[in-house]
Amino acid sequence: MVGAAGSPYHDGLFLFDLHLPATYPTAPPEVYYHSFGLRVNPNLYPSGTVCLSLLNTFDGEGVEVWSPARSTLLQVLVSIQGLVLTADPYYNEAGYDAYAGTPGGRRNAASYAENACLLTLRSALHLLRRPPRGFEGVVGAHFRRRGAHVLAACESYLRGTRVAGDGGDGGGGERTCSAGFRLALRNVVPVLAAAFAEIGVEGCERFGDGELGQCSLTAIDDSAASADASD
């Protein structure tokens, strides 16, 4: 599954195992997420558990839970794509939707989106280094096709562009991504670019430590100067 545009998961690759138990379709399918030990989303556990009402791994009622008469595998996949890998995963945490639209909620959503973006990049590295058996070609083909787009987005973040989500619409959130996020990104991107270069993605050389570091530090200095001027 590919992360959607407009979310912190954009262009990321997410692999799930689906198993149909003997009790299917009376019981829902069993779904395992290849997490590499990372918590990229409130619904995707490091253990591989996918927390979703439709899978009976989270509380729900009515159409939210599995029904042998109406629920389908397609519905499971669409739910993961549309309800889990969202633009604002922070609000997927139980009870956090009550903070949607508040200044505190926006700040927390922005911070969570930044972390989700970083973990998505780290997941990409794990996939490139240790793709699940039988999926080596899928992983390589995806990142050869989208790797340049991933790096371009990272370059934009290093210049201050905010990660997609609820954090910066003028209602109490930040207009740019945080300096801490850019510093963390500065460490991840050169490693990711090197991994992309190994599979044939072009243009990765300009994302080396030297030039990238100067770009990110300049963006952070500019952001700090703007903040000082507004105080």
Language-model segments: residues:
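Residues embedded in well-ordered secondary-structure elements
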Residues: A5-S7, L20, N41
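Proline-anchored loop/turn motifs at beta-strand termini and strand-loop-strand connectors
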Residues: H19-P25
